[in-house]
Amino acid sequence: MSRIGKRPVELPGGVEASVSGQTVEVKGPKGTRSFKATDDVTVSVDGNVISVEPRGKSKRARQQWGMSRTMVQNLVTGVTDGFKKELEITGVGYRAQMQGNVLKLSLGYSHDVDFTVPEGVTVTCPKNTEVIIEGNDQQLVGQVAANIREWRAPEPYKGKGIRYKGEYIFRKEGKKK
């Protein structure tokens, strides 16, 4: 029995959920999100509670049970609080700034890197060494943060690059003479 899957998902005030077939749609103050569950699980809404049940006893049904419940929980969290990733830029001359819908990154290359922000995500730069990514889709927010970090991942000798806020960078000692 799935310890995660058997717990129902509570709907906070101001959030509505509907199920049509295998598609769960959640509406809240931060927008609307939907998720298509696999045929191995049954999703139902009872008042302000969403419950997910497996359709059989197969291993795949039990695997999908916990995953589907977590996906529904992420829909509810996304439309109420949203998701947020913070990046820190470390290095001499490394900086970021927003220009309309484009994040302009100076990362020590011979040219600036222009990153176009996709729909459904907002990117802000409170300081030129900080980038904040927010949205109601956890997967999209994380993917955008990973794509930005990929341009200059932190290196282990000086720690220069783009890192997640609070991320520990394993440091190495340089060569000895």
Swiss-Prot record:
GO terms for cellular component: cytosolic large ribosomal subunit. The keyword RNA-binding applies. PROSITE patterns: RIBOSOMAL_L6_1 (PS00525). Coiled coil: none annotated. Disulfide bonds: none annotated. InterPro entries: Ribosomal_uL6-like (IPR000702), Ribosomal_uL6-like_a/b-dom_sf (IPR036789), Ribosomal_uL6_a/b-dom (IPR020040), Ribosomal_uL6_bac-type (IPR019906), Ribosomal_uL6_CS (IPR002358). Pfam families: Ribosomal_L6. One of its GO terms (molecular function) is rRNA binding. Keywords: Ribonucleoprotein, Ribosomal protein, RNA-binding, rRNA-binding. GO terms for biological process: cytoplasmic translation. Part of the 50S ribosomal subunit. Belongs to the universal ribosomal protein uL6 family. This protein binds to the 23S rRNA, and is important in its secondary structure. It is located near the subunit interface in the base of the L7/L12 stalk, and near the tRNA binding site of the peptidyltransferase center. This is Large ribosomal subunit protein uL6. It comes from Jannaschia sp. (strain CCS1).
